[in-house]
Amino acid sequence: MTAPDDVCAVVLAAGLGTRLKPLTGLRPKALVPVGNTPLLDRALHRLAAAGLAGAGRVAVNAHHFAEMITEQVGTRAHMSIEDKEPLGSAGAVGNLHGWIDGRAVLVINADAYVDAQPGDLRELLDDWDGRTIRMSGHRADDGHPPFGGLAFAGASLLPAADAAVLKPEYSHLVLTTWRPAERAQRLEAIPLDGTYIDCGTPADYLAANMHATRGQNLIAEDAVVTGAAHSSVIGPGSAMFGVVRRCVLWPGARVDADEVLTDAVRVGRDLTVKVTGA
């Protein structure tokens, strides 16, 4: 499956992840693992399934722990480093003006968990006239969906003309692009056929991992497990000798034989982020 040549993609991975601390004090939000796969890798896989891959078609922006993101991306995408401060969703696109080179832009967030059919992003491209702004949307729980009866689900397709006017300064697409397009009746919300979880808080992050487990355990091949695990994610190189229920063990984490963890994220030997109300 290939995407039209006049479309490129920008993956937003420069967020600070403030609400996800202390986890984001160790790695950027885009690299926290869900189901033992970093969120950024999940985003790049989604784009590849829609026909967008490689440094000529995909760019990733970075700020917080930029060197980690650059290493993770490797040659899979063009890197746009925002050194001084993150530029926001619109500023990130404006900062890539030369690389975009007059193409339409599919902008996706790297910090959300999406479980959908392979190639789901193609739905934003199918039968597109190149003039409307499209966004992926999901049913909102709060009863006040902001866009065409849907809440934003992490992906937006910008016509070339709309992308070209964005500037490399701090700004967000919701104000610069989406709302003006909505007022002009140029905004289309395309329902996401799948699950979308914004991993903004520890509770949401745990929920995304629990969705990925589907009620089972996800255990990395090289993990050592002699204890009892229930609906948990156990990362590469980790050691689990105790009891864990609905937990996430990051790579290299350890749970000793005398420990019982429930609804928690364990990093290393000592850092435990407990989730209340999970």
Which residues make up each language-model segment?
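Conserved N-terminal catalytic core of the sugar/cofactor nucleotidyltransferase
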Residues: M1-V11, R19, P33, T37-P118, ...
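Short alpha-helical oligomerization interface
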Residues: G25-A30
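A generic local structural motif
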Residues: R42-R46, E71, G91-N95, G119-E123, ...
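Short loop/turn motifs at secondary-structure junctions
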Residues: G51-G54, D101, D129, V243, ...
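Active-site regions of enzymes building and remodeling cell-envelope glycoconjugates
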Residues: T75-S80, G143-A151, C247
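Catalytic-core segments of class I nucleotidyltransferases/pyrophosphorylases
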Residues: V105-L106, Y113-G130, R134, R139-G215
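Extended beta-solenoid/beta-helix repeat architectures
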Residues: A207, H211-A278
